[in-house]
Amino acid sequence: MLTNRQIKILQTIVEEFIKTNQPVGSKRILELLNMKISSATIRNESATLEHEGYLEKQHTSSGRTPSTKGYRYYVDNIMKLDSADYTRLKIYLNQLLDLRKYDIDKTINYASEIISELTKMTAVVIKKQNIKDIKLKKIELILLSEFLASVLFIFSDGDVQNKMFNLKDVALSDLKIAIKLFSDVLVDVKLDEIDQYLNDLKHQLFLSIKQYDYVLNTFINTILESKNEQKETHGMRYMLENPEFNDTNKLKNAVKLVEQLSPFDWFNIAYESNKNMNKIAIKIGNEIDQINDDISMIATELKIGNSSTVLTLVGPKRVDYNQVNQLMNLIIEIINTKEN
C-alpha cells in the first residue's frame, strides 16, 4: 500500500512525464511538489516506487518514468474528473458540434474526429448492427485437405460465416476441442450477450489447447465481424507524430493494431471495467499484449436505441489519461442528451 507521500510523488512523475516526455528527476519533483521534504527523501521514495514496479529508470544518471503498473495505479486511484475542466471542454465540444446539424451517427463521427485532434490519438469508430435477437445456432468443421479446414458459423437469421484454417498453424484436434467448447458455451446465446461468457471460455481454452489465444480471437472475430455495419478511423497521422513510434517496428505494430481492431477487442478490454461498473475501459501497455507495451487503448460503447457504436482511442502509453477520460465521459453525455 502506497503512502500519501509516495502517491504524490507518483502523481507528479506521471503528470510531468506526460507533458514533457522526459524522465523526471528529484530536483524537478521538489520544484513541483508543495511539500516540505528534502531531495534525499524524494530520491529514497522514488527508489522504493521503482523497486515496487511503479517507476522505471532508463539510465543511472537520469530521472524516472512511469511503468505500466504506475500508469495503472494513476488511472485507478489518482486521476479525477475536474469539474471546471469538464465544463470548459463541454462548452467547447458543444460549440464545435452544433448538435442541431447532425444525426447521432454523424455526431459520433465528428466528435471522434475532434477528440482525436485534441488528444493526438487515433480514433476508431465501429458501428454494430442491431444483433439483439440474433443467436449463434451451430458450428461445423469441414476438413478440406490434409492441411486445410473450414469452420462454419451458422446464425439464427440464416447467415453463415466461413473461416479457413491452415492446419500447420493450428492442430485439427485443437480445432475440434475449440468447436465443442464454443458450441457448449455459446450456441443459442444472443450475440450481444457473448461478452458475459468470454472469461470462462478463455479459461477453458487455455486449459485445453495450445493456440488458445489465436483460436479464441479468430472464432470471436468471425462471429462478430460479420455483423458490423461500418468502421471509420480518424487521426492515423498522429501515430507518425508521437515520438514513441519513431521506431519503425513499433509504428508497424501500432498501425496493425488499429487496422485489426474489432468488436472482440471491445469485449476484451472492457471485461474488467464492466465488472467494476465503469463506462470507460482503459488498457495500458502490456495489458494489451507484450508486443504493444508502448500503447494504450481507451474505449467506450455508446448505446443508441437497439444499436451500439464502439469508440476506441489508440495512442502511446504516455497520454493524458485525465483529459481522455473527461472527453470520453463528455461524448457519452452528449450522445445520451441528443438521443433523449
Swiss-Prot record:
Keywords per UniProt: Repressor, Stress response, Transcription, Transcription regulation
Source organism superkingdom: Bacteria
GO biological process: negative regulation of DNA-templated transcription
Entry-linked InterPro entries: GAF-like_dom_sf, HrcA, HrcA_C, WH-like_DNA-bd_sf, WH_DNA-bd_sf, WHTH_transcript_rep_HrcA_IDD
Annotated GO MF terms: DNA binding
Family assignment from sequence similarity: Belongs to the HrcA family.
Family matches, as HAMAP family: HrcA
Function: Negative regulator of class I heat shock genes (grpE-dnaK-dnaJ and groELS operons). Prevents heat-shock induction of these operons.
Protein name listed in UniProt: Heat-inducible transcription repressor HrcA
High-level lineage: Bacteria, Bacillati, Mycoplasmatota, Mollicutes, Mycoplasmataceae
